[in-house]
Amino acid sequence: MAVSEANAAPMLVLSDFKGQGALYDGLIRTLNDGTFVHAYLISSPAGMGKRTLARLMAQHLLCTGDGKPCGTCPACIQVRENNHPDVITVTPGKPLSPEVKSGMAGIPVDEIRYVNGLVGQHTFVGGRRVVIIERAEKMNQPAQNALLKTLEEPMAGTVFLLLTESPELLLPTIVSRCRALKLHPWPDEVIMAALRAHSVESTMAKKALSVCGGSIGQALSVAADEAYWQRRRDVMQDFFGISARVDILKVSTAWKDRKDEADGLLSDVEDMLRTLMLVRFGKQDASLLEDYPEPWQRLGREGELPSFMKLMDAVTEARRMRMNQVTWQAVVEQLLLSLMEEKSKWSM
């Protein structure tokens, strides 16, 4: 991995994708021997590195240095800085076509027609051109049909990289004309190696691993995000540390004005409960229990699956209440009651 400057976000390099196993081996082989295809479909849940892999593939295809991608030649730098003239990036809400309004949630047909027109022109530098379509599932059906025509008659030297979290929303005929690159959650050991490579101390690395959902980028991001951990400390203190019903009103009142953090709070509670469950069943390091008050530590050591499922259901119910326009303070109070009920069983 590399960091371009002090305090900059860490950047993955192509070799970091060795953690994806056979996907990496096959991709490197085709890139190195020139047998790459004209279209790839890169799919994964959010945060697994689709955009990063697309950038690295573009660097490899356009690199003018040795050891592709070298990362230091003008082409590699331009790709990294998103200003290479032969890399076309389609992003929902940020149209290239003057006929498309900015801020649109989807990718309309006029945007794809505009891209098709660009693809038909000579490259600026000479050689290859790369077209990256982010959130490809956001193309409406006319847009997908317009892209399909181009994929059926590919221009020599042009490589399409379609990025999506929902490949099932793409036309089967588009999917069939792309080589699938399906990214999976990164193995724990790969994420820990990445954190160590960036000098993240051991305790923080374990915490970042427990909340990153298999995403290297997310792990590196939260490890350096003090505001994130401050909110989690607040959640731990207020939601897991509360010991008496008389404190519920006090806590709910304190969180009433933090409604903009509601999604994050519920995710934090869910993550903390999941960590307890994973520790209990040997899937996470037991040292993670040290952050929890003693009754919750006991749950993490001795709890049974029904207890964890009941707590997870309480978070699901809180989300349902929010969707039904229940006041945020009432949602917080109901969640606190559910947590206190379970905590009381482990306070003996």
Segments (PLM) and residue ranges:
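Conserved strand-to-helix beginnings and helix N-cap segments that scaffold or border functional pockets
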Residues: 141-145, 263
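Conserved adenine-binding aromatic site and its adjacent loop/helix in ATP-hydrolyzing domains
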Residues: 117, 149, 172, 176
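Charged, glycine-rich active-site and insertion segments that engage polyanionic ligands
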Residues: 2-60, 78, 156-159, 165-268, ...
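Hydrophobic residues in beta-strands of the RecA-like P-loop NTPase core, especially within AAA+ ATPase
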Residues: 42, 133, 147-148, 164
